[in-house]
Amino acid sequence: MEARAQARYIRVTPMKARRVVDLIRGMDATEAQAVLRFAPQAASVPVGKVLDSAIANAAHNYDHTDASSLVISEAYVDEGPTLKRFRPRAQGRAYRIRKRTSHITVVVSSKEGTR
């Protein structure tokens, strides 16, 4: 049994989001929620929301209400489209600013031996 959740077009750079996702990959779901709650990175908020959604999907789709018996089997961040902006500089020049977006995916599954 596995349940997945995905958040797309999140305005956080993929590199920063991957730092947070690497923290929780392979953890128990409740332990990962606690880690994300106290993580100082700003990307921990959207990753936490995706994890909560994956746990809720497991409860809804499979009547799997016990979150402590779920483990994060997959968690990854893909790069979304980049918003391009320009900052005016001296003598008619302009610097390009890239505002990157992320697609965050979390898959939870039941631990081995539990149903």
UniProtKB/Swiss-Prot annotation:
Q: Which GO terms describe its cellular component?
A: cytosolic large ribosomal subunit
Q: Which UniProt keywords apply?
A: Ribonucleoprotein, Ribosomal protein, RNA-binding, rRNA-binding
One GO MF term attached to the UniProt entry: rRNA binding
Q: Which GO terms describe its biological process?
A: translation
List, alphabetically, the InterPro entries matched: Ribosomal_uL22, Ribosomal_uL22_bac/chlpt-type, Ribosomal_uL22_bac/org-type, Ribosomal_uL22_CS, Ribosomal_uL22_sf
Function noted in UniProt: This protein binds specifically to 23S rRNA; its binding is stimulated by other ribosomal proteins, e.g. L4, L17, and L20. It is important during the early stages of 50S assembly. It makes multiple contacts with different domains of the 23S rRNA in the assembled 50S subunit and ribosome.
Give the family from UniProt: Belongs to the universal ribosomal protein uL22 family.
| Subunit structure and binding partners | Part of the 50S ribosomal subunit.
Its protein name is Large ribosomal subunit protein uL22
Give the originating organism: Streptomyces griseus subsp. griseus (strain JCM 4626 / CBS 651.72 / NBRC 13350 / KCC S-0626 / ISP 5235)
